[in-house]
Amino acid sequence: MARNIGLNVQPPVEECQDVNCPFHGNLSVRGQVITGKVVSDRMLGTIVVGRDYLHYVRKYKRYEKRSSKLHAHNPPCLQVKVGDIVKIAECRPISKSTTFVVVEVQKP
């Protein structure tokens, strides 16, 4: 039985025993919710999410394209592959560089 995490997302069908799962563990989510594309899934339990955004340059009164990569924890109950569009939510720091967790997978 998945618990309500306070976001408008569908809980996963599978269950897991991960302590850092927002649905089946003790991890609470708060703060930003970001959508991005999975760039890498080679780390154990962690994925890299890339996102593109526009940044305004005042001098030229134009926008420039920028990109960033974020590390996110990947719970075992969500099957995430490279190329998937995922929704990640901010949480407490899980490791040195991981402060987000995957909450929803939207297939490409």
From Swiss-Prot:
* Transferase listed as a keyword: no
UniProtKB keywords: Ribonucleoprotein, Ribosomal protein, RNA-binding, rRNA-binding
Spell out where the chain crosses the membrane: none
Identify the InterPro entries for this entry: NA-bd_OB-fold, Ribosomal_uS17, Ribosomal_uS17_arc/euk, Ribosomal_uS17_archaeal, Ribosomal_uS17_CS
Keyword set includes Ribosomal protein: yes
**GO CC terms of this entry:** cytosolic small ribosomal subunit
GO terms for biological process, alphabetical: translation
Name any one GO molecular function. Answer: structural constituent of ribosome
The family line of this record is:
Belongs to the universal ribosomal protein uS17 family.
Subunit comment: Part of the 30S ribosomal subunit.
The function of this protein is:
One of the primary rRNA binding proteins, it binds specifically to the 5'-end of 16S ribosomal RNA.
Under which name does UniProt file this protein? Small ribosomal subunit protein uS17
Native source organism of the sequence: Methanosphaerula palustris (strain ATCC BAA-1556 / DSM 19958 / E1-9c)
